[in-house]
Swiss-Prot record:
<keyword id="KW-0717">Septation</keyword>
<keyword id="KW-0131">Cell cycle</keyword>
<dbReference type="InterPro" id="IPR019987">
    <property type="entry name" value="GTP-bd_ribosome_bio_YsxC"/>
</dbReference>
<feature type="binding site">
    <location>
        <position position="37"/>
    </location>
    <ligand>
        <name>Mg(2+)</name>
    </ligand>
</feature>
<keyword id="KW-0547">Nucleotide-binding</keyword>
<feature type="binding site">
    <location>
        <begin position="174"/>
        <end position="176"/>
    </location>
    <ligand>
        <name>GTP</name>
    </ligand>
</feature>
<feature type="binding site">
    <location>
        <begin position="75"/>
        <end position="78"/>
    </location>
    <ligand>
        <name>GTP</name>
    </ligand>
</feature>
<dbReference type="GO" id="GO:0005829">
    <property type="term" value="C:cytosol"/>
</dbReference>
<dbReference type="InterPro" id="IPR027417">
    <property type="entry name" value="P-loop_NTPase"/>
</dbReference>
<feature type="domain" description="EngB-type G">
    <location>
        <begin position="22"/>
        <end position="193"/>
    </location>
</feature>
<dbReference type="GO" id="GO:0000917">
    <property type="term" value="P:division septum assembly"/>
</dbReference>
<feature type="binding site">
    <location>
        <position position="59"/>
    </location>
    <ligand>
        <name>Mg(2+)</name>
    </ligand>
</feature>
<comment type="function">
    <text>Necessary for normal cell division and for the maintenance of normal septation.</text>
</comment>
<dbReference type="InterPro" id="IPR030393">
    <property type="entry name" value="G_ENGB_dom"/>
</dbReference>
<protein>
    <recommendedName>
        <fullName>Probable GTP-binding protein EngB</fullName>
    </recommendedName>
</protein>
<feature type="binding site">
    <location>
        <begin position="142"/>
        <end position="145"/>
    </location>
    <ligand>
        <name>GTP</name>
    </ligand>
</feature>
<dbReference type="GO" id="GO:0005525">
    <property type="term" value="F:GTP binding"/>
</dbReference>
Amino acid sequence: MNVHNAEIVISAVSPKQYPESQLPEIALAGRSNVGKSSFINTLINRKNLARTSGKPGKTQTLNFYLIEDALHFVDVPGYGYAKVSKTERAKWGKMIETYITQREQLRAVVSLIDLRHPPTQDDIQMYEFLKYYDLPVIIVATKADKIPRGKWNKHESVIKKALNFDKQDDFIIFSSETKEGKEAAWTAIEKFL
């Protein structure tokens, strides 16, 4: 998809704030600082529509981005960030669960995982949760530019094994720095529109 128009529509904390449109939605999930905002910005050819931050735990709402009047990206709060209180974390967890299990417009979830490291327990739980609810998942392995290309396959195998990866899902190696995987990500997303 060639994106010329993208805007943030609303930052929602509850279902009554979700956009009323029937446009398909693609949710973006991943632990704090995995590169969700950079992923959005790369896909929509913008520097900073989605605010990137060195501070983990920055996204605390469901941020709906309208893309080309054709779909919404929904950025969900990053999980696994220790400096957020248990109460906060439980609140985010409930908000994410409500959205993922009840939103009819949700077509697929892009689950972002850092290619450099084995998936965390949170990454694995998120993947299992999405599979339990029968949601199509696109795994995007971020920060590929940080490791030599020759090691990508090994890292991909480690991630797939830890997740007990479903071969029906897409697996994309991605870098917001080099734009590696940008086209593949759009191809995977467009299948669900």
